[in-house]
Amino acid sequence: MADSTSGVAEAKADTLREQHLQLLLEIEPAKRCSCPLAGPDSAVEDVHTQLDGDVCHAEVTVGDGDASKVVHATTSVGDDCLCRAFAEFECVPRIRRADGECIVVETYLSDRAVITDLVERLDELTERVCLRRLTSDGRGDSTESKTATIDLSSLTAKQREAALIAVHHGYYETPRRTELATLAEALGISKSALSQRLNAVEAKLATAVFDSE
């Protein structure tokens, strides 16, 4: 699927910034979400969107049997607009899949600290947000998280922050690329406090895995 979706409230052509963090998010839209991707009639293959004030113009390519068709949708942009939420943090959402149940979005950020704020904002607008992949590239040590899907909506803000920094710095890789003390120093907390947060995260994720089986 081509990189296609763009939604930026205000153009800032004079601002250039390397976006070296790649996120892949799985989002379950709110029940009354106005986005045309929240309830497509068929599987979405490609999306192009353009925000014009409070109006969203979308051209959605959907599967239609053995063929495909392009559907144009014009909707009023509400407070639940996902494109606007991404634009608040100066990143562009790229729709990778939408099937009526969830929307898979890829985006890039320049600062790890923004991840938590972005996820918290999306969590306010949606039923559920899951981080499927966190990748760091463009810095000479490209590494991709090998962990399973993390349901971020089940974690507290502090647990979410601890989980994200642990994944990003390779704490759960084998062998580990960082130590607990280094992560605790980066967060400005004690090793014991970080250990408690990560233990709580791991317990919640383990419970979620068994509950889904």
Swiss-Prot record:
Q: Which PANTHER family match?
A: DIMETHYL SULFOXIDE REDUCTASE TRANSCRIPTIONAL ACTIVATOR
Please describe what this protein does.
Answer: Involved in activating dmsEABCD gene expression related to dimethyl sulfoxide (DMSO) reductase. Required for anaerobic respiration on dimethyl sulfoxide (DMSO).
**Name of the protein this chain belongs to:** Dimethyl sulfoxide reductase transcriptional activator
Q: Which GO terms describe its biological process?
A: cellular response to dimethyl sulfoxide; positive regulation of DNA-templated transcription; positive regulation of transcription by RNA polymerase II; response to decreased oxygen levels
The HTH bat-type domain, residue ranges? 155-206
Knockout or disruption consequences: Cells lacking this gene have no dimethyl sulfoxide (DMSO) reductase activity under aerobic, anaerobic without substrate, anaerobic with DMSO as substrate nor under anaerobic with nitrate as substrate conditions. Cells are not able to grow anaerobically by dimethyl sulfoxide (DMSO) respiration. DMSO does not activate transcription of the dmsEABCD genes induced by the anaerobic conditions. No effect on aerobical growth or growth under denitrifying conditions.
Record-linked InterPro entries: DmsR-like_N, HTH_bacterioopsin
Q: Which Pfam families match?
A: DmsR_N, HTH_10
Keyword Transcription regulation among UniProt keywords:
yes
UniProt keyword Cell membrane, yes or no: no
- Tell me what turns on expression of this protein: By anaerobical conditions and dimethyl sulfoxide (DMSO).
Taxonomic lineage: Archaea, Methanobacteriati, Methanobacteriota, Stenosarchaea group, Halobacteria
GO terms assigned for molecular function: DNA-binding transcription factor activity
Alphabetic keyword roster: Activator, Plasmid, Transcription, Transcription regulation
